[in-house]
Amino acid sequence: MAPRKTVGILGGGQLGRMLTHPAALLGIPLLILDSGSFTPAKQTLLPPPSHSHPDGPFTSEPHIRKLASACDILTVEIEHVNADVLEAVEKEGLCEVQPSPKTIRLIQNKYDQKKYLAEKGVAVAPFEELPANPTEEDFKAIAGRLGLPLMLKAKTLAYDGRGNSPLKSTSSEDIQASLKFLGDRPLYAEGWAPFVKEVAVMVVRNKEGEVQSYDAVETIHRESILRVCLAPLRGERGVNQRARELAEKAVGHLEGAGIFGVEMFLMPDGELLLNEIAPRPHNSGHHTIEACLTSQFENHLRAILSLPLGSTALRVPSAAMVNILGASSTMDAIDKMADNALTVPGAAVHLYGKAESRKARKMGHITVTAESDAELNERLRTLLFAQPDAHADWIDLIAPPSPAPAHSHPKPLVGIIMGSDSDLPVMHPATKILEKFGVPYELTITSAHRTPERMVKYAKTAAGRGLRAIIAGAGGAAHLPGMVASETSLPVIGVPVKASVLDGVDSLYSIVQMPRGIPCATVGINNSTNAALLAIRILGTSVPALNKATEEYSKALEEEVLAKVDILEEEGWDKYIERLKK
């Protein structure tokens, strides 16, 4: 294998630190430019032989040029760099720069970025530039066009909410408060986006312009700082794919190679609006280290070095990332959160090696993976309640508590539906089987004939909400199981319900006689027990613990029958029959 090219990184923070891990595994020499000899990134990887990690500001022209002279490729872990120097370095042939300095410069100015994307047909919220030294009349005029409230944004040097200020009215007090918060920076205004979720997609782009996206994630912020990511994005059917397509479209219009973090808003009507792009690894992609076949950090290096891009697929059905934020100047809270995470199955701790803690500073993160959303939910609650600023109400919104008995689980794997409440006595045994196996489920009523729109919506959103199987009970015409099967990709198990006439045979025939291409499993009349057991066997193909539990259940049935055989032989059948009559 030919020696790898040497990569220089501008910035030695936590993103650079996490780039060093795959670099070491792939034998990629790295040189890291930042002030100090013990930055997070410099702690974890030695420089190539006869070199040392340069010590100096990553915005300094002399230091950038010195780094460029020792490297084959320069890249960034932060976009607030000197794009002019990077452009000059590349033009002079000192070294290659990825992503393109042109792209970095564009992204540095959020107004220019938004204007460019809008011109390329990428969906964004309405926005307008504010003049230099805007007057109150300027604010009133723009509010008249964009409406109130609106978001005032700094064009440059804005991250973690530090460049955003909501303007709720055009009163002098509100205007001056926003101007004071944003400081003496050029501004633009953006129409208010009353989103239902904030979404992010990581996209990797190689030098040939090929783009691949990771599954979209839901990003949950508190006080404008990212706190939790949930992967994959759950919601209406197709929303994950639409988010990926929007992100790929946006990154496809940029120049250069590397990983890009694309943030967007999911609106109440299902529309997706792009918010902004980061030309580097992103906090919303940290889960990819444990949760995906190739991490965002490895794929960034692969892309800029023209190595084959790695698969972006998830390794696990469910994953989350929790940021570890400083609570004070001491490390006590950080250590407590990390130690607590070590007790949580599927959790991996990443501490960034920062020497000083301060309130709201990103000191590390925890990735947690699970076989299901419900399992992830419980693990996530343990992690969130260990945070020093834990608030039960906020945590319950992100990771709802387990339900009371005989109530639907907030993160179900199996859906139980029926056409009428009169079917409940028949479907009730299925709930007991699922509870016995510890399978989270939901139960509701939806009729193929009386509530067809509700039925269609349920079927179309089931997979996107994390369900993996549906048990549908119906009597008479019994169209519910088949109709649901025609609207979802999930396995549907029909339970024929015995009605007042025909003893349920009509229901059985209706469910079992589905046309080719629309499979619908069918169990015996009124036998929701077998429907639940079949659903568990389906889940067991991907959840080993359920497969083992099914084997134990079958073994218990065998032992029960063998015990009866022994009693029958010991007592004789006459006494056995008499005991059965009792």
Swiss-Prot record:
Gene Ontology biological process terms from the UniProt entry: 'de novo' IMP biosynthetic process
Protein name per the record: Phosphoribosylaminoimidazole carboxylase
SUPFAM superfamilies, sorted: Glutathione synthetase ATP-binding domain-like, N5-CAIR mutase (phosphoribosylaminoimidazole carboxylase, PurE), PreATP-grasp domain, Rudiment single hybrid motif
Keywords: ATP-binding, Decarboxylase, Lyase, Nucleotide-binding, Purine biosynthesis
Superkingdom field: Eukaryota
Gene3D superfamilies (alphabetical): 3.40.50.1970, 3.40.50.20, ATP-grasp fold, A domain, ATP-grasp fold, B domain
Enzyme nomenclature, EC number: 4.1.1.21
Binding site for ATP: 143-200
Pathway of action: Purine metabolism; IMP biosynthesis via de novo pathway; 5-amino-1-(5-phospho-D-ribosyl)imidazole-4-carboxylate from 5-amino-1-(5-phospho-D-ribosyl)imidazole (carboxylase route): step 1/1
Family: In the C-terminal section; belongs to the AIR carboxylase family. Class I subfamily.
Higher taxonomy: Eukaryota, Fungi, Dikarya, Basidiomycota, Agaricomycotina
Molecular-function GO terms, alphabetical: ATP binding; metal ion binding; phosphoribosylaminoimidazole carboxylase activity
Record-annotated ATP-grasp domain positions: 114-305
Species of the source: Cryptococcus neoformans var. grubii serotype A (strain H99 / ATCC 208821 / CBS 10515 / FGSC 9487)
Catalyzed reactions per annotation: 5-amino-1-(5-phospho-D-ribosyl)imidazole-4-carboxylate + H(+) = 5-amino-1-(5-phospho-beta-D-ribosyl)imidazole + CO2
